[in-house]
A protein has these predicted regions:
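Heptad-repeat alpha-helical coiled-coil signal-transmission segments
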Residues: 17-20, 24-27, 31, 38
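Charged catalytic carboxylate motif
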Residues: 19, 69, 114
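Periplasmic peptidoglycan-binding/anchoring modules of Gram-negative envelope and division proteins
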Residues: 25-33, 47, 58-89, 93, ...
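Short small-residue beta-strand/loop micro-motif enriched in glycine and branched aliphatics
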Residues: 6, 55-58
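Soluble periplasmic/extracytoplasmic beta-strand elements of cell-envelope proteins
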Residues: 37-39, 44-54, 84-88, 117, ...
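Bacterial Sec signal peptide processing site at the extreme N-terminus
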Residues: 2-22
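Extracellular/periplasmic catalytic domains that process cell-envelope and extracellular macromolecules
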Residues: 39-41, 69, 79-80, 127, ...
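Periplasmic OmpA-like peptidoglycan-binding domain that tethers envelope proteins to the cell wall
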Residues: 59-64, 90-167
Length: 167
């Protein structure tokens, strides 16, 4: 039969979907709407955190408020039964200023440093290191136009992608 799935496969998919829904609901109770956007996608949950929640303007190290936010979600991430948690860093297309140019030649390096700092903090808060990875995309994956201040603000973000949940 073409297009049929076994009852066992169907039940496993229903259980997995329920796990993603539970994770999404738990994260929504831990974070305010102004702190993060949470989306449940096919096979993953994505948290989008705006850069000012985590970093000083042009900075790459997570500030105290950002550390507090990450500490709030770390226990949930630690117990999420995920096989992979990828922290992705993104920037706008404004070139790196002279103060940071020697450390970060481009937005690519800045976005990677931001993602890496978030990973370090999550690991320090108890998220298993073997689940964590950091990736930087610079200005290569904008979610809004870089032609306006509002669009650039949307593009400066960190996304935490939780995937491969197991029962």
């Amino acid at each position: 039969m073409v297009g049929c799935v076994s009852e066992q496969t169907y039940d496993a998919e229903v259980q997995k979907s329920a796990l993603y829904q539970q994770l999404t609901a738990k994260l929504q109770t831990e974070l305010n709407a102004d702190e993060a956007q949470i989306k449940q996608l096919q096979g993953q949950v994505k948290l989008t955190l705006v850069d000012q929640l985590l970093f000083a303007e042009g900075g790459w190290q997570v500030h105290q408020k950002g550390k507090a936010t990450l500490a709030k979600i770390a226990p949930t991430l630690s117990t999420a039964a995920a096989k992979r948690i990828v922290v992705e860093g993104f920037t706008d297309n404004v070139p790196i200023g002279p103060a940071l140019k020697s450390r970060f030649p481009s937005n690519w390096e800045l976005s990677t440093a931001r993602a890496t700092d978030v990973v370090r903090i999550l690991a320090a808060e108890g998220v298993p290191q073997d689940l964590l990875a950091a990736e930087g995309f610079g200005d290569q994956r904008p979610v809004a136009s870089n032609d306006t201040p509002q669009g650039r603000a949307q593009n400066r973000r960190v996304e935490i992608v939780i995937s491969d949940l197991a029962q």
